[in-house]
Amino acid sequence: PVVSISGDGGFLFTATELATAVEYGINLVTIVFNDNRHGNVYRQQKEWFDGRFIASDLHNPNFVDFARSFGASAEYVETPDQLRSALERGLSTTGPTIIEARQVRDLPTPWQYIIEPPVRGPHAVDRQGGSAK
């Protein structure tokens, strides 16, 4: 089996591929952490654009009902123990399983260690290390 972990916004980009997973009986467990937000977009708008937010909040479907409408197994969890049990069930299920896990907003982010913030103005440098033009 394959385990996929994504946020709600990222999952929605390709959620209809669930139909293919059901059709071919692909053993896939997808954990969707749902905070009703494009978290990375929101974070960038907050940090890089002085909190000017646009199109970062989501109005999501019920992911359990959504998955079941394709014929996939699905369940909703609220605690780490429930997630562990749901993952074990999903790994032993034939075909795809969606696990929706509610997530609180504004959790600490690792992005400050992963990506550099944008630089604008006279100190901007292009990707090859030269001066901005």
Describe these PLM feature segments.
Residues 1-133:
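Thiamine diphosphate
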